[in-house]
Structure formats: structure tokens, C-alpha cells
Amino acid sequence: MRFPQPSPDLRVRWCSAYLKIDVCAAVLRNDERFRNIRTLILSGERGEESKQRAQYAIFEPDRADLRNGMKFKRHIDRFRPLRDWKEQQIWDLLEKYRVRPHPCYFMGFGRCSCKFCIFGNCHQFASAACVSRQQADRLIAFEKDFGYTLKRDTDLASLISKGVPYETITAELASIATSFEYSQPIIIPNNEKWKLPAGAFRKCGGPM
């Protein structure tokens, strides 16, 4: 076995395909609720995130679309309203409507993605290991079992040792972020000040 590879090619970066993209497509294709109706999928990619995402269409038929089907029709469009937005606009919108950012941003992460994302840099991995040491150790053990490393140029233990965990990580934030239940209000109450999280505008390893 091998880990998914940091590549635009979804055949080798299989985590994005099998665990995210194909899961949604499978539901749309197999659930009869989506037959003979019109469905709009809202997708949050921004062109600022990568060159490939900058080329995505803002509006197009979804990969699960079957609007010209013979037995039944499945009319599904995909809309990317944020494709041309800048990160500043996103934070401004969250502040305007008092939306609470995900706790990972308050810990210092610049992206809310998989905790040990294959695109992560040494500081991201060191921070993730700080939050979830047992999971990090399990990935390190997988490298030894597979005979292949997650990163092409280094092993995970060395990568983590080179990084510096974000100083804004706290036990409370780590507990909130890793809990199976989330009880904080999504909309911040009026008696609480909205705060820009430490991870805002932080450059991190991200999508290709």
C-alpha cells in the first residue's frame, strides 16, 4: 500500500477522489431522491487557493448530472460562487454575520482540511502531532509497514521534528477541535466579540 501523493492527478492523489469527490457523486447518482428534479450543488473552492482551482468554471453541470437520461433524468448543476473571492472577503463576510470560525483556525492553521493533509508543511505536521500525538504515531508506523513515506523526500518523524507547533494551540482548543460533539454557537452572541483567528492569512501547504 501507498499513501496518496501530492499531485493534481486524482489517480494518485486518491484521498481527494475516494474520500470526498466520489462520495458526493455516489450519493447523487444512487439516491432516487435526486431523480427528475433540479439540484444545485454549492461548492466553496476559491481560485486564490491554486492555479487549478482558478480555472474551475463558476457554473457547470455536475459530474453526476444526467439531464438527458433516457430512463430518468437527474439535473444537477454545480455553482462555485466564491471562485474569484479573496481571503479577506471571506473573513469580512464571517465577521459581518458573526459566524464563528472553525477552532483549527484559532489554533493557527491556515486551512481547515484533513488534519494530516499530504500537502502540509513541517509546521502543520508538528502542530497536528501536538494536537493528536497518537494519530501521528500511527501514521509513522504505517510508513514503516508500507515501506513508503507519506512525503516523497522525508519520513514523517523527521518532518515533524523540523516543524514548530503553532504557539496559539491550547488544550481547550485542541479538545474542541477533536471532539465528536460541537456545542459552541455557530453565530456568535452579541455579548461576545468576533475575533480574527490566528490562522487567518497564514500560508500553508494546500491544494494543487
Map each language-model feature to its residues.
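Nucleotide-activated chemistry modules centered on ATP-dependent adenylation/adenylyltransferase
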Residues: 1-208
